[in-house]
Amino acid sequence: FTQWYMDHVMSNIAAAGHSDLTNINGFYRNQWNGLDKSPVTSLLNVDGKIGFIPGSFGIQFYQDELGQENNTMMKLGYAYTLSPFSSGTVMSLGMSVSYFSKSFGTEWIATDGWENDPAIPQDDNTSSAVDLDLGIYISKPKTFYAGLSMTHLAETEFSEMSIKPVRHLYAMGGYNYPLDGDALVLRTNILAKTDLNASAIDMGVNVLYNEMIWAGVSWRPGDAIAPIVGFQYSMINKDATNYKEQLFRLGYSFDMTTSELQSYSSGSHEVFLSYSFKFESTPILNRYANPRVL
């Protein structure tokens, strides 16, 4: 996703709970518009702190369609938070278990026919596998973050398809630079990913104005340049017994293809929607008068 930096948990489970809020993040991406059966990807992430233990949870639902291929994945993860450093920096270690389902359709097109090709499924074919992800993540709120993670650690094979997911390594980092007090903040982000055979990198920069509006650009060398805009609105209500914090975020990006696909694709659209919250209550202690002073 072009707006990956709005939800680090999608690439690194150890980032769960670092915002101190419970987060519900959704992404929808329509890639390479103009191509028949181009990729359509949806993702829903939920993460937050677990009150009775020093850690956080992460739940992910992922669905992707590309041509005749359909992928569905569900993840359940936990991030253990170490004691904060004196500077306010927090480090976490995370692990997630995923259930991955892959299927292929039958609407194949080939100039020389496909009926007798053993490499092309003749019927609807579905297979599933269980996998494992690990990660480490460090951050200081509103200042910087860095993380390293590995997905498909078990490389469990889809037995009915003879397909094995390949391990992927992700390294991410970012820093926020105040430009005008708290009114303007320059936010930089970078994500490098590799399966040790091929590599890709995402670099982005955006400016957040008045904690409400942001705009910027993301660049994937050899693939796309993407303008990005977004809006957020926060509400904090508190009294003697209750504290309620809510944050709404909405983002949009448009990938302008720079690869050879630009002759066939009009670009890619992506929408990000998020709701974050924190509700706390302080119990009221009963008070009794002393009859000796009545």
Regions found by a protein language model. Give the residues of each.
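Subset of outer-membrane beta-barrel
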Residues: F1-L294
